[in-house]
From Swiss-Prot:
Organism of this sequence: Homo sapiens (Human)
Keywords: Developmental protein, Disease variant, DNA-binding, Homeobox, Microphthalmia, Nucleus, Transcription, Transcription regulation
CDD domains: homeodomain (cd00086)
Gly residues composition bias: residue spans: 226-236
Compositionally biased intervals (Basic and acidic residues): 55-67
Name of this protein: Retinal homeobox protein Rx
Length: 346
């Protein structure tokens, strides 16, 4: 952008107020619109005289430097002529251009804090973040016998001691309060495991399968042909009998008894060398059942036993838990022998 009237002033190589004046359309010079007038400079200021000379000298020097640094285009050598010597190196410029920073090591810091971070430093930071952090492993505490004894005594008093009790106990056993707290947590977990094991073992002992195996099985009496349980044998009403071992129906007792598994006539079920036992006491004899007679009622809870019978069959042996299988077989055979004769008479 050129202002009118500035060309003569630039040719003289100096700035003058007349060259930069913007005159009004009327031709009056009352108002000045030059840069020097706006900034408040006048002709008497020294800066106006020195600025154009310095600017011209600097521009000429820059032009000389650019012309000297530009290499000349080499000409193609003619045939048969010797190669021309290499051109002389260009003179070094007065200042060097800034070069990019190249760190020797990836973790080397940049000397200038104002410059941006290079890619090598960023890669080093990423590699450090990718490395897994080492897991902090706490050393295991080894307790002495005295410490364990005192801790167990405190655990018997209270499973959940407060912070004051823990601090007092920690000072007594020479341990940190945190270690005492962790010990109580582990001890409570161990105590809960022991309680669960005890409860599970008690449930297994009280299960019906184990209680059934302890009591004598009632199925062992079936092949022995145990008779009706109303009259009672030597064991009386203490032995629990099955429902099919009840008193026979009138008129069909022998048939129902022979239809049971493992039961037959006394002569066939017993060997020939078997000697019948002595007759049972009088109160054990059951009257023959006629067609019009009803089955006997259950016996009374107690019987007047003689001294000989009490010595032979004590009350302790009547308990099925104390009696053995051999004793039960012998009692069943005696009972069959006792009630077999009246049924044969029918």
């Amino acid at each position: 952008m050129h202002l009118p009237g500035c060309a003569p002033a630039m040719a003289d190589g100096s700035f003058s107020l007349a060259g930069h004046l913007l005159r009004s359309p009327g031709g009056s010079t009352s108002r000045l619109h030059s840069i020097e007038a706006i900034l408040g400079f006048t002709k008497d200021d020294g800066i106006l005289g020195t600025f154009p000379a310095e600017r011209g000298a600097r521009g000429a020097k820059e032009r000389d430097r650019r012309l000297g640094a530009r290499p000349a285009c080499p000409k193609a050598p003619e045939e048969g002529s010797e190669p021309s010597p290499p051109p002389a190196p260009a003179p070094a410029p007065e200042y060097e251009a800034p070069r990019p920073y190249c760190p020797k090591e990836p973790g080397e810091a940049r000397p200038s804090p104002g410059l941006p971070v290079g890619p090598a430093t960023g890669e080093a930071k990423l590699s450090e973040e990718e490395q897994p952090k080492k897991k902090h492993r706490r050393n295991r505490t080894t307790f002495t016998t005295y410490q364990l004894h005192e801790l167990e005594r405190a655990f018997e008093k209270s499973h959940y001691p407060d912070v004051y009790s823990r601090e007092e106990l920690a000072g007594k056993v020479n341990l940190p309060e945190v270690r005492v707290q962790v010990w109580f947590q582990n001890r409570r977990a161990k105590w809960r495991r022991q309680e669960k094991l005890e409860v599970s073992s008690m449930k297994l002992q009280d299960s019906p399968l184990l209680s059934f195996s302890r009591s004598p099985p009632s199925a062992t009496l079936s092949p022995l042909g145990a008779g009706p349980g109303s009259g009672g044998g030597p064991a009386g009403g203490a032995l629990p009998l099955e429902s099919w071992l009840g008193p026979p129906l009138p008129g069909g007792g022998a048939t129902a008894l022979q239809s049971l598994p493992g039961f037959g006539p006394p002569a066939q079920s017993l060997p020939a060398s078997y000697t019948p036992p002595p007759p049972p006491p009088p109160f054990l004899n059951s009257p023959p059942l006629g067609p019009g007679l009803q089955p006997l009622a259950p016996p009374p809870p107690s019987y007047p036993c003689g001294p000989g019978f009490g010595d032979k069959f004590p009350l302790d042996e009547a308990d099925p838990r104390n009696s053995s299988i051999a004793a039960l077989r012998l009692k069943a055979k005696e009972h069959i022998q006792a009630i077999g004769k009246p049924w044969q008479a029918l």
